[in-house]
């Protein structure tokens, strides 16, 4: 019975196609003849006659045998009405599908969205929280209810937190977080444009007279510098108030110029630390005053100094001893742990985010130690290999460069170790020249940047272990490097500071000074660079050789890209004084121009 019905449907469909192609005058007798033959078909097949064209369309497309169940009367009327429409007759099959698709699209436009009639508001918020800003904007165009959900304050507050805007704020601080998000993105775009176009302001931090710069460090826009005279100065570049206070020492009986040179300086949000050539260590609390809160003495010269960036922990290395200092519950400083190593320590870092008990990493020649203050445990991470050339740590990893054994054997590499497991994770590089600096803590996730003796800056992919990008940045060795999600700032031994857009593999701009670049630190809106001379012996600083003295004393520059001013068209720092401020010292004039404030 089913085979007979299938043959009958195919025969009738072929007749209808022939009638659609025949002249109009021949359609009427053929249609009358077809109507005369229609009662001959059985009563069981007559109920399906109205749905024959739609069924035949599916059969001609290869749908196979017709379904066993019969269509309802409403469905049959709907299909029959579509089969009698002129557009369906002219389309002859393909047109019917297009018309049906158009009708379905129009019906969907008139339907009420699912969230408007089914879901509670809180559940809709939980679903929308997984959308980004573009998807939220599209959802706001669906209906009025979706617009209210897509512009909820909770969603835009979470977007601000996810993209790093206003991380310390709460949801009650602002009334329209969508507007705040737009303003933050506009500011971010402006800062990126200023970085690329070298648009902003640059200042040279005031130098201590008759001295040579020894060491520079910075944290969150606060700069600390040590000099050959034993002076230590601190600048807060966030307020553009460059009248830097001196951090005094306890030895008031020392005559000016008789204090030992400063070897190392470090700073974080609350502490400043300075190590001197005679083995003394001064610790200042920036919140209480300019006098040190603790003074510690080593028997020999301090070879390495480290300061934790998130708590009050100081680590020093002198001779074969490594000492960790931290305050107790009453606030008095004490020795938290003391270690003895068989070789002299060249590199020392404190692991961040270690909570109560500090952990340090020390490199001594061809040995690498993990030092834990909790039980004074000394764990050997790396031994009996090439000497270590550079070091950096993150919360759970340590990366250090090792010397190569020559191009015949093995090149210089960077080894990445897990601090928790104490085993090697990656071996990166394998280049001819030695790595001179590595930055793991400030790099984006799964990336790391390094500098080499060959003057090249390399980006390493920590997932694959390959070199993602290699830039020929400097003529001499790279001395400092830092990267973020789109740019690299590097400093070389020749005194050149270069800014690169590594996504485009393009150098944006560069600045030159006569001394090696020892320190580089930047944020989204500022950049701090320090050129420290190798030779710290004071040259003749009399009036006749003032230019020689200025050339050999070092330089600290602070760049600010949040202002709408060309960096290299701005007036020099000596020309930024007010009209009533005119000071001189050894002809180092602070000139005053009235048009500066016009």
From Swiss-Prot:
Phosphorylation at Ser-85 by mTORC2 promotes FBXW8 stabilization, allowing its translocation to the cytosol in response to insulin. Disulfide bonds: none annotated. Pathway: Protein modification; protein ubiquitination. Keywords: Acetylation, Cytoplasm, Golgi apparatus, Phosphoprotein, Repeat, Ubl conjugation pathway, WD repeat. InterPro entries: F-box-like_dom_sf, F-box_dom, Quinoprotein_ADH-like_sf, WD40/YVTN_repeat-like_dom_sf, WD40_rpt, WDR55_POC1. This is F-box/WD repeat-containing protein 8. Residues 113-159 form the F-box domain. It comes from the Eukaryota. Transmembrane segments: none annotated. GO terms for biological process: cell population proliferation; cilium assembly; Golgi organization; labyrinthine layer blood vessel development; negative regulation of insulin receptor signaling pathway; positive regulation of dendrite morphogenesis; positive regulation of proteasomal ubiquitin-dependent protein catabolic process; proteasome-mediated ubiquitin-dependent protein catabolic process.
């Amino acid at each position: 019975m089913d085979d007979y019905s299938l043959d009958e449907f195919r025969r009738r469909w072929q007749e209808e196609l022939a009638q659609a192609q025949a002249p109009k005058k021949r359609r009427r007798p053929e249609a009358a003849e077809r109507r005369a033959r229609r009662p001959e078909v059985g009563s069981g097949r007559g109920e399906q006659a109205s749905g024959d064209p739609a069924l035949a369309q599916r059969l001609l497309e290869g749908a196979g045998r017709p379904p066993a169940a019969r269509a309802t009367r409403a469905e049959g009327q709907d299909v029959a009405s579509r089969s009698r429409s002129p557009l369906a007759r002219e389309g002859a099959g393909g047109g019917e599908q297009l018309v049906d698709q158009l009708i379905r699209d129009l019906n969907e436009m008139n339907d009420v969205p699912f969230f408007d009639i089914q879901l509670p508001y809180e559940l809709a918020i939980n679903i929308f929280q997984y959308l980004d800003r573009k998807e939220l904007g599209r959802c706001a165009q669906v209906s009025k209810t979706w617009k209210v959900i897509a512009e909820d304050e909770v969603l835009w507050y979470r977007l601000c937190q996810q993209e790093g805007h206003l991380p310390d704020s709460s949801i009650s601080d602002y009334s329209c977080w969508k507007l705040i998000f737009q303003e933050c993105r506009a500011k971010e775009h402006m800062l990126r444009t200023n970085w690329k176009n070298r648009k902003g302001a640059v200042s040279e931090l005031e130098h201590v007279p008759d001295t040579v710069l020894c060491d520079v460090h910075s944290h969150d826009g606060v700069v600390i510098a040590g000099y050959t005279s034993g002076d230590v100065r601190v600048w807060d570049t966030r307020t553009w108030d460059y009248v830097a206070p001196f951090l005094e020492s306890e030895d008031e009986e020392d005559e000016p110029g008789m204090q030992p040179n400063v070897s190392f300086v470090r700073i974080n949000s609350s502490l400043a630390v300075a190590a001197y050539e005679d083995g003394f260590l001064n610790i200042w609390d920036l919140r209480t005053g300019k006098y040190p809160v603790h003074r510690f003495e080593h028997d020999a010269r301090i070879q390495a100094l480290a300061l934790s960036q998130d708590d009050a922990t100081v680590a020093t290395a002198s001779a074969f001893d490594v000492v960790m200092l931290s305050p107790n519950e009453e606030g008095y400083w004490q020795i938290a742990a003391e270690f003895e190593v068989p070789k002299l320590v060249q590199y020392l870092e404190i692991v961040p985010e270690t909570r109560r008990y500090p952990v340090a990493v020390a490199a001594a020649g061809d040995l690498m130690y993990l030092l834990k203050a909790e039980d004074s445990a000394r764990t050997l991470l790396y031994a009996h290999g090439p000497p270590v050339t550079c070091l950096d740590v993150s919360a759970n990893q340590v990366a250090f460069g090792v010397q190569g054994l020559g191009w015949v054997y093995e090149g210089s590499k960077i080894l990445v170790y897990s601090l928790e497991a104490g085993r090697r994770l990656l071996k990166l590089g394998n280049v001819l020249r030695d790595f001179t600096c590595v930055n793991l803590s400030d790099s984006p996730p799964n990336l790391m940047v390094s500098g080499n003796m060959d003057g090249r800056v390399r980006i390493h992919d920590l997932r694959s272990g390959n070199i993602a990008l290699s830039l020929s940045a400097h003529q001499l060795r790279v001395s400092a490097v830092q990267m973020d999600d789109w740019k690299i700032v590097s400093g070389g031994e020749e005194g050149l500071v270069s800014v690169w857009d590594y996504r485009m593999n393009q150098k944006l701009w560069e600045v030159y000074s006569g001394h090696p670049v020892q320190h580089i630190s930047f944020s989204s809106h500022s950049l701090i660079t320090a050129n420290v001379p190798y030779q710290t012996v004071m040259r003749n600083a009399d009036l006749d050789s003032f230019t020689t003295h200025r050339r050999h004393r070092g330089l600290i520059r602070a760049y600010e890209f949040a202002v709408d001013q060309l960096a290299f068209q701005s007036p020099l720092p000596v020309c930024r004084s007010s009209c009533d401020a005119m000071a001189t010292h050894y002809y180092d004039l602070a000139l005053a121009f009235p048009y500066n404030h016009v």
